[in-house]
């Protein structure tokens, strides 16, 4: 029996401390407990790639009247399993609800499947949604993103650009963007990446990192490599991002901290990555893939911690 309170569980989930959760959870009892605890268990299982187990819990919760969140996450599980038709059934049911903010999430989930599941009636409902004065900025942004995709699919690129611009402007209100600071970070990381391979040695793990801009073909390359009997695909892991955030919070910032990592710190982060990524692996295949397009920002960190790792960078002309 684990000793985790729901507050502790929630906090560890939010911090991405999945290895600590794995250590402290009684995995034989994840399908029992209060509705709140079951939802937390399902989140943990989903985040560690145990989608079928997560789906089973969300199915139980979704049968409870009014459990909107469970129905949404059940759709996410079906999508992750490749069952797009069933995922669409769940999303569509939620889009027919009464709460505009929840409808916006459901419509975006449908649009984000890239299966052209929305029609003219949906477009009109989304436009009506934007006319609501009490629609939250987050929901308004999702509605604009969804309309942007709809207009792009119809060939009206001018209208699509307008909706996408509005959506990004809404997001920027809460997450301001500083292009100059980002460019400075990239230049500092590029200067360091060339010398990073000579700084660390490790036999902990030697993953294959697949990076590149979104929609560049990273998923296809992952599927091709994972067809090999000794290669295992994992998920779009966020552990490098966790390391980068921890380094960013220290004196000097991300780029400078990579350059100043001590041998002890490198061993600690190597072990953290190895243990965390192992949660997504079966232990039967020697090579694991970490496919996350956004990890292009962490190439210098990869070179510092895993000098013998393979990095596949996808560029789409």
Model-derived segments and spans:
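TPR-repeat structural position
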Residues: 18-19, 51, 84, 120-123, ...
């Amino acid at each position: 029996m684990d000793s985790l309170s729901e507050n502790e569980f929630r906090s560890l989930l939010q911090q991405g401390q999945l290895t600590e959760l794995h250590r402290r959870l009684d995995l034989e009892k994840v399908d029992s407990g209060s509705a709140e605890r079951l939802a937390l268990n399902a989140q943990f299982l989903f985040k560690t790639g145990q989608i079928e187990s997560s789906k089973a819990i969300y199915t139980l919760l979704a049968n409870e009247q009014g459990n909107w969140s469970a129905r949404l996450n059940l759709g996410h599980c079906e999508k992750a399993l490749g069952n797009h038709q069933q995922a669409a059934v769940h999303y569509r049911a939620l889009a027919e609800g009464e709460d505009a903010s929840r409808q916006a999430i459901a419509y975006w989930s449908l649009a984000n499947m890239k299966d052209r599941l929305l029609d003219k009636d949906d477009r009109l409902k989304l436009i009506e949604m934007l006319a609501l004065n009490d629609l939250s900025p987050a929901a308004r942004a999702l509605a604009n993103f969804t309309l942007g995709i709809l207009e792009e699919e119809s060939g009206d690129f001018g209208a699509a650009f307008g909706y996408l611009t509005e959506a990004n402007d809404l997001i920027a209100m809460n997450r301001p963007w500083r292009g100059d600071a980002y460019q400075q970070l990239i230049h500092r990381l590029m200067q360091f990446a060339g010398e990073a391979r000579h700084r660390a040695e490790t036999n902990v793990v030697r993953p294959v990192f697949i990076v590149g801009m979104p929609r560049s073909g990273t998923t296809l390359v992952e599927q091709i490599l994972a067809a090999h009997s000794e290669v295992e695909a994992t998920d779009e892991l966020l552990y490098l991002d966790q390391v980068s955030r921890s380094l960013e919070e220290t004196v000097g910032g991300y780029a400078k901290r990579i350059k100043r990592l001590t041998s002890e710190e490198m061993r600690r982060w190597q072990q953290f990555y190895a243990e965390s990524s192992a949660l997504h692996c079966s232990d039967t295949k020697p090579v694991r893939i970490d496919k996350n397009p956004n990890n292009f920002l962490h190439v210098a960190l990869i070179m510092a911690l895993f000098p013998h790792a393979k990095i596949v960078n996808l560029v789409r002309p």
